[in-house]
Amino acid sequence: MYNIKSRQAEEFINHQEILDTLEYAQANRNNRPLIESLIDKAALCQGLSHREAALLLECDEPELVQRIYRLAREIKRKFYGNRIVMFAPLYLSNYCVNGCVYCPYHAKNRTIPRKKLSQEEIRREVIALQDMGHKRLALEAGEDPRNNPIDYILESIRTIYSIHHKNGAIRRVNVNIAATTVENYRLLKEAGIGTYILFQETYGKEHYEALHPTGPKSNYAYHTEAMDRAMEGGIDDVGIGVLFGLNTYRYDFVGLLMHAEHLEATFGVGPHTISVPRICPADDISTEDFPDAISDEMFCRIVAVTRIAVPYTGMIISTRESEAVRRRVLELGVSQISGGSRTSVGGYAVPEAKEEDSSQFDVSDRRTLDEVVSWLLDLGHIPSFCTACYREGRTGDRFMSLVKRGQIANCCQPNALMTLKEYLEDYASSETKEKGIQLIREEMEHIPNPKIRAIAERNLQEIGEGKRDFRF
């Protein structure tokens, strides 16, 4: 039976409720008055239920789809403006004991070189990332209790935060590791992580078990209930997501929204971020083996309806996606992207030869961080390297309250401009710097509070004189 507040996976992600939702959406896909009423409801920026969102996703009337896209753009601008947060993944180890059939890290893969970074190698990786201009990382590691124990992750976090090369600093470390215990989540919280990220992969239990035949990750309930344990352990910023293409997109879309609803109903705060990766080629993995892979157009629609349904959440895409797709979804709801990414272990300090490739997936957008920043500036976006909310205690329900009331821009806009100024001074090419300075000049006029604007102007001047790390 469906129970949004249950702590049991098969009740808050209830199979029958998903089937009933899909049946409802299919039955009403041509019910124009109902769909229009839902678009009007969504325009109030209070979100939609999983059932309502499923109907919008099912709608294929061109005029209504364009209305959905326009609304997604408006909601994204209302909550997140034209700011795009930048981050990079850092792969610590690809040792893994699981048997996930879609991931090249699976235990039976004998062709991929296995690597685990030492603390000195992590130091070199972080310096390389700092020299690009990154301030925010997402740590990635395979699940292997012997090679990648929690103590290794904690030591790695301490190492990363300790490194300050030239003007560089990693100010926020998000962590994407396997489902673990409440006690281990407490340890991660004490280590100062930002967001704990864990993708469900697919919400269909039968599909999940078929895709994860061996290893600790094969336990559907333990994996699905991980975010509950993380929040019990004191982590109030969590990031969820599915790997679209493993199961039918309709099923996983509904499951994703039900998970967000469960977290909000149970803990008073929904997911800090929602990621929307798609299955893509990798070592010994072919997308031809996954018949549920989705088109670019459907991917864009999923992003748009997710933004409408969960207006407060940050939305993330990686360099799995091409430049063209990333451009479209930035307008439709995405608020965070990676840039200059390497998905191999140790790939920043010493790029690998193809025959030694330890990547988790093939990268589609291979541009440097400076090229991505320049591109965002050309599109009128503000590339933001801000990590202030985490360091000022604006996390969990405090952060969400500010976002939902539309007040987060009072902090985010000046912080984005100040961190962009740092990037331009320390790392940008001359062409990117020129464009960025012009955009900062224009965007300063859009800060409505004259007191905040005056402080930001003074801080920008001091950044130009060599000072760093101002924040509201």
Residue ranges and their predicted role:
Residues 1-37, 41, 324-332, 341-472:
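Radical SAM enzyme core and accessory elements
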Residues 80-81, 85-121:
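Canonical Radical SAM [4Fe-4S] cluster-binding loop centered on the CxxxCxxC motif
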Residues 88, 126, 154-161, 185, ...:
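Generic structural signal for well-ordered alpha-helices
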Residues 141, 195, 200, 221-285, ...:
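Conserved C-terminal portion of the radical SAM core fold
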